[in-house]
Amino acid sequence: MRTRHGAFLLLARPATERAHTPEQDQYTLPTLTHLDRLEAESLHILREVAAECEKPVMLYSIGKDSAVMLHLAMKAFYPARPPFPLLHVDTGWKFREMIAFRDRKVKELGLELLVHMNEDGVREGVGPFTHGSAYHTDVMKTAALKQALDKYGFDAAFGGARRDEEKSRAKERVISFRSAGHRWDPKRQRPEIWNLYNTRMHKGESLRAFPLSNWTELDIWQYIRREGIELVPLYLAAPRPVVTWNDTLIMVDDDRVPAEIAAKAEVKSVRFRTLGCYPLTGAVESTATTLDDVIQEILLTTTSERQGRAIDKDQTASMEKKKQEGYF
């Protein structure tokens, strides 16, 4: 067909009439599953931050989200190792199984692990039983994290937080900026359009990056099953000594539990949906001993996975206040 200017216009035939050859099948893009898309997004975030920032680090809390994030980091930079170390802020009150798992896993992968503890808090004898969850978290987690970031000069820290976990995390950006004092101002967050991330910082600022922002608890568990990711055994049900303390079912993990509390302990079949300091992490009664059992439980549950975390109950909007002060 010729236009009035003399040029030829080729008219495309309707899709139903277009010729198709078997050779074209090899160029057809594969259909990505829901988990494939989440994985691709996370890999992009990891590579983007690693490329744009001078000295990134990955926060490693030893939990299921950290396990998934570490697995993604190993994929993102394969066959090389991740171009950043792992940082574990040790409060001194983690489950013994967590610490043993951490040391073994890091050794197996051949990664650099930095462990930091707030020595001022240790000298003061700060602990959840003696000082309460709010003060313990502020000194042994928040202050310790800021100390470590300043000590090593990191300008970016990867974290495993997800938006479905808690209200303040739901409104935080994938790339979350911190002031020179590591404070977060939710009113000054930058817009994030599609998958375009602005990592530019003013002098003294730093950022936190959350590759798992758009994942849900169910996504995490389905990905763990698909990828065969190893976890701390505490996530699966087993007979464990537990006692109710401050309306939370906690595990008696060592002899630092006050005698009057430990004396009331009973052995029950329990597991943990989230892990932290053992006196501040509630267990749930469960018979889920396999990944399939856990996934089935999650499909039927009507409560948040963080319902057993004492630090989320300190006061109204406690998590947002902690994040503004520099918490993970």
Curated annotation (Swiss-Prot):
Keywords of the record, alphabetical order, are:
ATP-binding, Nucleotide-binding, Nucleotidyltransferase, Transferase
On the tree of life, the source organism's domain of life is: Bacteria
Q: Where is this region: Disordered?
A: 309-328
| InterPro entries given in the database record | PAPS_reduct_dom, Rossmann-like_a/b/a_fold, SO4_adenylTrfase_ssu, Sulfate_adenylyltrnsfr_sub2
What's a BP term from Gene Ontology annotated to this protein? sulfate assimilation
Q: Which GO terms describe its molecular function?
A: ATP binding; sulfate adenylyltransferase (ATP) activity
**Catalyses which reaction(s):** sulfate + ATP + H(+) = adenosine 5'-phosphosulfate + diphosphate
| EC number(s) given by UniProt | 2.7.7.4
Specify one Pfam family.
PAPS_reduct
KW ATP-binding (keyword) present: yes
Q: In which pathway does it act?
A: Sulfur metabolism; hydrogen sulfide biosynthesis; sulfite from sulfate: step 1/3
Q: What does the annotation say about its assembly with partners?
A: Heterodimer composed of CysD, the smaller subunit, and CysN.
Q: Which NCBIfam families match?
A: CysD, PRK05253.1, PRK12563.1
PANTHER family xref list: SULFATE ADENYLYLTRANSFERASE SUBUNIT 2
**Would you identify the family this protein belongs to, as annotated?**
Belongs to the PAPS reductase family. CysD subfamily.
Q: What does this protein do?
A: With CysN forms the ATP sulfurylase (ATPS) that catalyzes the adenylation of sulfate producing adenosine 5'-phosphosulfate (APS) and diphosphate, the first enzymatic step in sulfur assimilation pathway. APS synthesis involves the formation of a high-energy phosphoric-sulfuric acid anhydride bond driven by GTP hydrolysis by CysN coupled to ATP hydrolysis by CysD.
What protein does this entry describe?
Sulfate adenylyltransferase subunit 2
Instruction: Name the gene behind this protein.
Output: cysD
